[in-house]
Structures are given as C-alpha cells and as structure tokens.
Amino acid sequence: MTQDKSIEPFFLNKVVDKSQLRQLIIWAFRNYGIARASNMADTLKDLGFLYATKAGISLSLEDLRIPPAKNNLLKTTIDLINDTDTKYRKGEITAVERFQKVIDTWNSASDTLKKQVIKYFTEKDPLNSIYMMAFSGARANISQVRQLVGMRGLMADPQGQIIDLPISSNFREGLTITDYFISSYGARKGLVDTALRTADSGYLTRRLVDVAQDVIIREADCNTSKGIVLESMIDNRKTLVSLHQALIGRVLAEDLFNPAGSKLVAKLNTEISPDLANEIISLGISSVLVRSPITCESIKSVCQSCYGWNLAHGRIVDLGEAVGIIAAQSIGEPGTQLTMRTFHTGGVFTGELAQTVISSSDCQVEYPSNIILSDTRTRHGDHAFLVEKDIKLKLLDFNKKQTSLSLVKGSLLFVKHLEYITSGQVIAEYPISNRLITEKAQKAVLADFSGSIYLMDLSVSNIQSEQQTFKNVIKGGVIWILAGHVFSIPYNTQLIISENDFIDENHLIGKTEFVSRYEGRVRILKKKQDFIQDIVIITSSKTYINIDVLTKFYNGYTNHFLITNQQDKFILKTLPNQTIVDQQLIAELITNIYRTNTGGIIKYLDLSVSDKKVDLNSKKDYYDIVDGGYVLWIGEETHEINKDISLLLVSHGQLIDEGTEIVKNIFTNSSGIVDIIQKEGIVREIIIKPGILYPHSKFYDHKSKSRGFLKPGEIISNDLKTDKLVYWEYFYVKNQSYTLIRPVIVYSIPSKTIQFKYSADSFNSHICSLKLVKRIYFRDGERVKSVSGIDIVKTYLIAELNKDSLNLKCTLQLNLDSNNRSISRMRIVTMDKLSLKDENNIASTKDLYTRTRLLVTNNQYIKSGTVVAQTELFSSLEGQVVSIQKNKSSNPRILLITSLDTKVFSINNNQNIKVNINDLIYAGDEIATNIISYISGQVISIRDNQITVRLGQPYLISEGSFLHVNNQALIQRGENIATLIFERVKTGDIVQGLPRIEEILEARKKSDSFFNPHVVLDSKFRQYVNQGLNLYDATRLSLLILQLYLVKELQLVYQSQGVEIADKHIEVIVRQMTSKVKIENGGDTDHLPGEIIELQKIEMLNKALRLASKEEALYYPILLGITKASLNTESFISAASFQETTKVLTDAAISCKLDWLRGLKENVIIGRLIPAGTGFNIYNNMQLNYQDEKYSYTKNLLSLPQNTKNLNFEDIIVDDRNAHMYSRNNNL
C-alpha cells in the first residue's frame, strides 16, 4: 500500500473472518482514503473469487455432523427433569417452580449443546462446509446451525408462552408429528411478522425523519462549557458499549489529565481519534466529559464541535450536514433487521439464563463479617440465601491459596459459611437483569386423579367479589388428593347405598324415576336412533265434527278451507302438524262484507273494543271487538306524491270523474272533489273526496267545529235537508268558503259465536279450544291513506290454551272422514314428550352404567303422577363407599375406594413399623425397617403383618394463590383445585425490541412499565426547584437526566439485538423530544397557559423581561413522543405534511403563523433549494469568515509533500485526502 520503505511488512497467520475483514477495510479507508480502500476491497474480492472458484463448497447430509456428546447430554437432562418431577410429586415444589425448572434445564441443555456443536466442528472438522459457511459470515448463523445438528430446543406457543416440551431432535434427525405441530406456531408467526413488522419499521423511520429533519450543522462552535460524561455501558455485568467505542469521534469538553500525575493528555475541544481513545483507556480513565448534541447551545441546530466526527468519513462533520436525517435513518434502518430475524429462527425461544458462579476447584467458602443474608426460595423451589448488600466471599483451596468472589445485592448464595465445595459446584447466581418487564400470571393446578381433598398447613381468607367468593391463600401449604373413584350422580337420583357400605361388581347404586306430570294416553313411538326411545303422552284430543275441511290444489300450492254448519267459509292459516301456541291465528273468514273501495276516515259508533295489541308477525296495532256495534266510513282516495305543483293536471276544488289523470300516469279510481295538500310548491297529497260542494250556510257559523256528521232531517244549505247520515266539512276554493257534504257508509258488526261439536273419542277438551274473534286494525277517527281499499274488520279463529298446559306441545291434525273421503276432520291434540335412553346404554364413565325400563304399555291411559320409566344406576367396580357428598351447587358425588386405589406392603415380625394409621407418607419414606415406600399417600390400615396405604398426591400451594376446593371435597381427574399466582418475565420472539423502541420514542405512559419517563422528569424538576435552583437550570438538569436515560434505554434494546448505533444519533432524536416546555403562567409574554414552546425561545424572552423588570413566564419541562414532537414543530408546513393536515393548517391559519422555511421538508414542499449540503449558505454565518477559511486551506496546502514525482498514483482515481484541501482560488 505505502511507498515508505522504512515500514517493513509483517506476516500474520490468522483467519480473516467477516469482522476482521470489516476492520481491515475501515483501517484502509481511515488512513488512505476512499480510492485506495476501494482498490484494496477490489483486490480482496478478486482474491476471494479466485479461491472460491478453485473448489465449490456444496452441502450434503453428511456435512450435518451431530456431536457425539448429544446423547449423553440428553440423558443427563432427562434425569434432571425426572428428579424435578419426583420433587413435584412429593409436594416439595409448586407447579410453577417445576415448570420453570424444566424450562431452564432444557434451555441450559440447548445452550450446552450449541457450545458442543462449535467445539466439535472447531476441533474435529474445521473444513466442514456448514461450519465454514456459518463462521465465515457467508451464510447462516449459529442459531440455524444449532437447529440443523444440535436440537431445535424450546418453542413458544401462539400467546408467546413457552411450551415445556422441547424439540430434542434436529433437522438432520427429523421431526416427529408432535415436534412438527409445535414448530408450526413459530413458523406462522415468523411469516406474519415479516409482513406486518416491516411496515412498523418503515413507519418508525418516517416519524423519526419528520421529527429531526430540520437538525442541520449550522455553525462551527456554540462555545458551550457543558457536556456529558461518557462511561462504558454495562448491563447485567456485560459490557454492551465500551468506553473506547463511545469515545471515537467525540470532542473533549474539558482538558484531560493523567490521573496518575498532572500531565495533560488532551486539550479542551480536541477530537478523539482511535489512537487518543486507546491512550485514554490505557491510562485507566473510566469516565470522560465530552461535547454532545444534547448539551449544544446552538439555536435550532447543532454545532460541529458538539456533534463531532461524521462517522462515515472519520473526520469532523461538514457544515450544512443534515445530521437529523442521518440520525433518523440510523435508528430506523435496524428495525427491519429486527423484523427479519424472527423469520429465520422460526419462533425458537431464546430465554435469558441466570448467570451462575461455578467453583473452578475444590475449596472452602468463608463469609465476610459484614454479610447480611435472608432465607429465600429460588424460582426452582430450592433453598438459598438472598444477599442484601454487595459482599466479597473468600475461597480457600487446600493449599491455603485465597481467591475472592464479588457478589452484588440481589444475588442468590447456595453454600453455607465454612462449607467445603467441589469443583463444578454452583456457588451463587447473579440476579437476572431487572430491565426485563414482569407480568402477573396464573397457573392452574389440575388434579392428576380423582379422590378426596385434604388441606395441610394452609391458611385461607375469603375475598368477596360481586359474583362470587374467592379463597385466597395467606400462608402456603400442601393440598393432598387421596385416591378414590368419584362418581357424579344425577341430581334427582334416589340412592340405595349409604356411607361405609361394601358393594360388589354390578351392584345397584340408585334409581331415577320418570314421572308424568299430566294424565293422558301413552303412545310409544318408533325408534329413530338406536339408543333413544321417545314416549308421547297425549293429554287432550278434540275432533270437530261440525267443521268440514276441504283441500284444494292450485299452481303447486295446497289450501285448506274450513266450512262450518252455518256455511261460513274460513281459510286455514296454520299448517297441519305445526306446533300451535296460545292466541295463535288458526283460520281467517273469507268475506267481502267489510271491504271498502278506497281509503277514508273511520269512526266507531257504539263499538266496544279491547286495549291496543300488537301483531308479532306484521308488527301492526290491532283491537279485538268485544261487543257488537257500528263502524262509520267516510270514503276518500289518497294519492301520496312528491312533485312540483306545476306538474298537476287538476286544480284544487275541481270536480273530477273516475279515471281522470291527475298527474302524468296517475289516474283516479273514483269521482269527487280534488283536495290538494302542498308545502312550499311541492304537492304532498292529492285527495279525491266524493261529495257535493254547497255555498257556505249561516247554519254552520255557530258551530265550534270545522267538520262533523249530519243526521237525517238536518239542514245542509238554504232549506235543503239531508235524508240520510252524511259528513260535512269546510272547504276553501280560491279564498271562497264552501261546505262539502260527503256520503257515509254504515257497517254493522253484530256479536257472533260458533257452537263447536266434538267426536265421542275426544277427551280433556278444556285444555285447548277455538274462539271466534273479530279484529279491527284501525283506531277510532283514524284517516286511512289508500287508493285501492281496505278490510275494516277481519274475522279469525284463534287457539286458546289452558294456562296450566302452556308447556305442552299442541298441534293441529287433519284426518279423512271415515264416512265421506272427500272431506277431512280437524283434530287438535296436546301432548307431553319424554326421551328415554335405551336399556343397554352405557353412562359417560366406564365405572358406572345404566339400564332404563319402561313401566307403561302403548295406548295405556295414565293418571298424573304415574311412573312411566325407571333408570337404574349400577357400579362396575367393587369397593367401599367412603363418602357421599351433596351440595346445592353441583350434583351429588360418591367416593368409592377400590383395590386399585390402595397399595399393600407386607412385613414380617422382625421389622419395626414406623408409621401410624392416618399418617401421610411421601414417596421415599421408610414405613418399616428396610421397607421404603415408592408411593405417596395415607396409611389406612395396619394389621395381619400388612400396611395398607391409600394412594395420594401432594401439591405444594404458594402464598397468594387462589383455592377452588374445600377440605374433604370430592373431585374428579382434571378438575382445577387451585390457581397459582406468580410473576414471570414477558417473553417474546427476537422482534420484541421493535415495540419497545417505539414505546420509548413515543414516550408512552405505560402503567405496567418499570420506568415511567414522564414521572421521573416531573419529580426531578420539582426536586431541583425545591432545592432553590432557578427555573432554567432546574429544567435543563431534569431534562439532561431524562435524556441520558432515554439514550441508554434505546441503546440497551439495540445492543441486546446485536445492532450497533452511535450514541450521537440517538442524542439528536432525544434532543428534539426534550426541546419543548409547557407554559404554566405567561407572565408579561403573549403566551397562554398550556402552550408548548421551545425552551431556548422562552428563556430568551425571559431574559428580555428580566432586563425590563417585568414578570417572567413560568413553565415546566415536558417529554414529547416523536409523533407529538413532529406535530408541534415550528414549521406548520412540515407538521401538516406529516399527519392531521386539516387540523394543523386550520390552527396555523387561525393563529396567523409564519413559516421561516428552516428545515428540509418545508423547502422541498415549497420548491426551494434545501438548506443542507450545497444549499447551506456558509456566508450567512458570522462565525466563519473567508479569511479563516483561506488560512486553513493554505495551511493544509503547505502540508502536502513537495516532491510528488516519486509517488505512485496509478492505482488512484482521485486522491481524496488532498482534493478537499485545494483553495477556491486555484484553477483546477
């Protein structure tokens, strides 16, 4: 590369992988410029191609080598899990602790296997194709290799919870059906995430760009003395960002001295290069004060010194650089990487294992004197000591060599004072990162078998809610389930057995009787299904012999007509064999007596009607006619139209004939006087009123009404009298008054009933009967708008059911008359139906079976209360009935102890019995000399050299859980006996980072988050104000604390995903989020309370007010999310182009806002040159003058080598180290 012969090249025998290659190219770029670095990258590419094409690397099944250690590892893991299950079965750990232990054991196994895979490839097969691909960075990653040749490991279900059954096989061995289905959750989630989260990532970038697009480097130095302290970022004892990495490209905010002496290392405003950063680290300096965009005092911009290097070029950032856009893209772009990564791993769980401290040799542990410990229980249910403050343990080996071990507060200690430990033993466990968000979760404890409940050492309190009472566990203990067969018996079963009875196989336990509530005739129906027998009890039957039913077929329709002995003809409205309900319409009388030709006005005369009712089918109101009377009908034809009055073909008051066209294509059906109702030139109705117009008579002047009836003999006009009942009303035509006399039709409605006759075989006829009902659908005085006419009164036959028989099924049947086959007879039947299970039907459990016997015969007439059938319940097991429980909320239960529920241990006379009757024993307990019980349970008998133990299962229940059973309760297998409440870490796939980033940047006020930034900002501000700081300083300091926290939080999320982002990018965004304050009191400014304004702007106003001795504005700092910050930007054009366009522009118009076009977006929208890059006007900046610039260029020119003839430039297109140094005066 270089022509300097004094530098000797050195040979380095090392594998150059992806990261080494990156470092090499960065070094070449930083030291030799872009042209030489590009050339070197080109030659490296050629070298790579040369060797890559010498031999093709293929992938075959043989390359997928499974490490031999896998089988032993799986065996060890399964043994550990079996030990955990044994502990659980002995009631030593809870279901939650068992689950956590199983998860952690498999997770640890998966992690160990991953290391074994790497070790195997490295040591045994370094030229393996898959190993070379993965570890050179060409293709795949360690997670994928692990799944190919190690084990797939634990998977997450659709809710994000871990399934405790891992996939122990890999893709090389192949998956079982179970493995495949467990895998499918993550696979689908990966595909969905790829689609959805890509959009989320893009939207995040858009919001970031919008919030920071106006941040441009506008000046060289803001001359601030402020800065931020940089340290290594450490989380959970892991260095995420080293101090060296954080320092490169920064500018010192103070002189830096060697801590060992007073020697100056670097001056104020010195740029920190990699060499200087190395020197700072080598001197042991752990924190450095540097300039930062957060503390920059430039107005509406950032200065060069506070920003530092442009990391792309490795030199100070240029003036006019749009650093806001760069920052937004730097933070937003990795979002896509976070998204895509889930797809590759397919939902494989990557949980955080607690970091354990393992002894490297045999030694003795010694506690320090100041140690403070408290007893605790680990999440696996083991006993441990909780370290209450940071300590140092002494470890003494057998050679008295001493080493120390530091433990932080919150660590778990597993060894006692002066205890001897072996190599590989776990000494302690560091606390899992407290940054993980936990959530309250529930775990149901289900009964593994049926039996009775025994509560041991549990303290319970009742909590009453609106719906039910909960039993809350105050002090933890054990729930025992003592085995037995539990039968749930139907509620109405009559038991034949009692407690302590011994029953044999096929013994009768109880019986259920089916009793008829009604008397009637029995009909045993033909079976439709093999095991169900239907019985019908006909409670009433009524055949009408004075009604003939004629059936007629027309156009595919069947109509049934009823003809009474009075020759009234009805049409049947209910289909035969259809269920009938009370007050159902059965038939309608066919008649035209009450049919009108048109609409009109209806008036009742001596007509008694019921209260208004509603027809459920048509939703119309109707009235039943209670007693006979008359209906008066004043006919009129009403046409409802909505047309302009100019389209009318008739005029108001005109007498027209039938068939007259009143509007185009609308003709009248009757003759009469035209009455036009119009509104604002639009005709609403045209009414044709039959009658005669008479000139106005003084006879009507004394009447207070404008319409009414005239009886026969009353005066119409000028001694003209009426000879019948008529209707009169005032009528105005062209401002002249007339009297319109209209004819009245009188409809007589007599009272009428039908006397029905029944056949001799009818019985219980009072249960259901038919009733003749006349019904009117219009109220008194109602005006019916119609053209064609209506039925004023309709006559129906209605079914009436006895109130006690409403639960019965009622049907209408048509049977052919035996004497005359052309007619049918109508029969109404009511019945009660019983469905009985057949004799051979087996009950839902194999331990019980039933037999059902019919106790009646077909056509038998029975009384109410007769037993129709009996179901008998038999046990298929033999044993002792220990308990019979009855309670109001559930069916009775029987507990039967059989030989299957007990275990007998035989002993001889020489063995001592170590248990008593009713003792509870655990698996592994010694019950007699040299006899170890391999089961848990209760001793129920000791006699004849035999110990009988009833099988049992203890369940450990932790404090705070909810209990669902009572002591001595009987439960069946699979029932929930308790719900454990515990805290768990919120798990998720690898993309969990993206929502967290969004949550921080949007400054969401989440209740379940362990840190609320809004609360912290407010409390810090109040604290500083109370300490006596002025408003500006209190705001600045509280904002600075929050800014540093937000930067760290965002870095933690990205670093945990393996994504590196320079702090300065995040600082630029955070600066925008924290640049505003909210006015509390405007003082003598023009600002109103609640207004959001820039901190720098309000402080300048306050300075001016202070000089003028006026009242200053009061304010407090606020944190705005990126969306809110974008909408609250000074430029309304930028805000409107982002979101809520109408609102933003309306607000700007009302407020008469000005847009100074400072940012990029607003200039692009207007069509101006953007104020960045070449569009940045350097001459407007007073701090930079042409002389300074000229001097710096000249100085740089002088530093160029004078003798350039000896330099070899043939590999350089443009030497970018020198190109930018030429003066503008040079003619290039």
Swiss-Prot record:
Bound cofactor: record note: Binds 1 Zn(2+) ion per subunit.
Keyword Metal-binding among UniProt keywords: yes
Entry-linked InterPro entries: DNA-dir_RpoC2_beta_pp, DNA-dir_RpoC_beta_prime, RNA_pol_Rpb1_3, RNA_pol_Rpb1_3_sf, RNA_pol_Rpb1_4, RNA_pol_Rpb1_5, Rpb1_funnel_sf
One Pfam family in the UniProt entry: RNA_pol_Rpb1_4
Gene Ontology process terms (BP): DNA-templated transcription
Cellular compartments annotated: Plastid, Chloroplast
Lineage top rank: taxon: Eukaryota
Catalyzed reactions per annotation: RNA(n) + a ribonucleoside 5'-triphosphate = RNA(n+1) + diphosphate
GO CC terms in record: chloroplast; DNA-directed RNA polymerase complex; mitochondrion
Function, in words: DNA-dependent RNA polymerase catalyzes the transcription of DNA into RNA using the four ribonucleoside triphosphates as substrates.
Family of this protein: Belongs to the RNA polymerase beta' chain family. RpoC2 subfamily.
Protein name: DNA-directed RNA polymerase subunit beta''
Species per Swiss-Prot/TrEMBL record: Gracilaria tenuistipitata var. liui
